Amino acid sequence: MSALLRDADLNDFISPGLACVKPAQPQKVEKKPSFEVEVGIESSEPEKVSISLQDCLACAGCITSSEEILLSKQSHKVFLEKWSELEELDERSLAVSISPQCRLSLADYYSMCLADLDRCFQNFMKTKFNAKYVVGTQFGRSISISRINATLKDRVPENEGPLLCSVCPGFVLYAEKTKPELIPHMLDVKSPQQITGNLLKQADPTCYHLSIMPCFDKKLEASREECEKEVDCVITPKEFVAMLGDLSIDFKSYMTEYDSSKELCPSGWDYKLHWLSNEGSSSGGYAYQYLLSLQSSNPESDIITIEGKNSDVTEYRLVSKSKGVIASSSEVYGFRNIQNLVRKLSQSASVKKRGIKVKRRGQSVLKSGETSEKTTKVLTADPAKTDFVEVMACPSGCINGGGLLNEEKNANRRKQLAQDLSLAYTKVHSVNIPDIVHAYDDKSNDFKYNLRVIEPSTSSDVVAVGNTW
């Protein structure tokens, strides 16, 4: 949430309705005529604060007055209290998962290489909290990507307009609350956070799952009705560091050369897999992986990259000289770009025409005899005309999540840090998604969200709103 909205002197009179981007309108009250005049008396009705979509996206997920209720189960202090109770009763084990963006952020913060950070983190969770499992999220991400690709292959031929990725809870909440027309175009495949949690709960149904994620919106994702049993608590790297401070712990004192990843991995899992990555963006590579999955059946094709008007918009096209544009996908990050995308997609009458036009335009360009390299110089990215869009609420994507350790940086340094982390991300060894999924995904779980339209709440009861989640 922006600093403006956190100011203590701000009158937080935003009704805690579920559509806070559309603040409740004050009811007009007719005043009875009076012959008495009061001087210097201010209105008894507090002035409502208007939150723009830019404030809402990539923050803490539409949270105002109900913040304490919504996040009552999602903080490092709650984790410490809960784990203390569980440890005394000795009823449950601890399972910890951490995303690659968080690992890179912590490695940068503690001036460690990624391998040292991973060993240090594993040792800390095992020694301090007696963790049974400590894993990365690549296993869950691989399954998420595979399920998304399979869904796209089924739905793209029949869908009018692009299909939208739903792994970013900030975008999902925005669509469910304010843009219900987008929901039919959104994929319901769960994120790596939830799939990892589901798999850990299968390995040990009694485990308490702590997930460390790059943004605060992931807390709200874990609070969804269909997700509650998969993740017990979500904290960010900022909160992880704050927890160490509360415990007066020197994290670097847990550095070790011993790799405990094998013994901290559930039985039957590839213990190396969790700490790897995959080709594509530092937000998960969903857009790129879709085309990569199709390229295997089109051996003479190439994937070309088309830059957008800014660095947060990128389009990919799978092309060949014989077939033209075979498929397309795009990445759209940040409020302004999401707003532009939604504006185009909301024009439902022209969505189908745009879907046809993009392929015809692509084919005509390639059939003119130009090479793929030359073609990219004359094309402009247009996500609204692609088959699939990887949407992330944070500018620069998940590598710039609000929960990462970059709060003290100014705008330029923050952007540079995101670029540095993205570069470091590309150096993480990549895995082949089809190989992983073939070996480990038994297809017995659907791993799906229950996407739905969220109607604005008419209740002013904060507790009632919190219970809605």
Swiss-Prot record:
Q: Could you list the residue ranges forming a coiled coil in this record?
A: none
Pfam families (UniProt xref): Fe_hyd_lg_C
- The disulfides recorded in the entry are none
Which UniProt keywords are present, listed alphabetically?
Answer: 4Fe-4S, Iron, Iron-sulfur, Metal-binding
Question: Which SUPFAM superfamilies would you find in this protein's record?
Answer: Fe-only hydrogenase (SSF53920)
List residues binding [4Fe-4S] cluster 2: C168, C215, C394, C398
Example GO molecular function: iron-sulfur cluster binding
> Where along the chain is [4Fe-4S] cluster 1 bound?
C20, C56, C59, C62
What does the entry give for GO biological process? iron-sulfur cluster assembly
Looking at the record's lineage, which domain of life comes first?
Eukaryota
As for what it does, the entry says: Component of the cytosolic Fe/S protein assembly machinery. Required for maturation of extramitochondrial Fe/S proteins. May play a role in the transfer of pre-assembled Fe/S clusters to target apoproteins.
> Which family, according to the similarity comment?
Belongs to the NARF family.
Q: What is this protein called?
A: Cytosolic Fe-S cluster assembly factor NAR1
Natural source organism: Kluyveromyces lactis (strain ATCC 8585 / CBS 2359 / DSM 70799 / NBRC 1267 / NRRL Y-1140 / WM37)
Gene, per the UniProt record:
NAR1
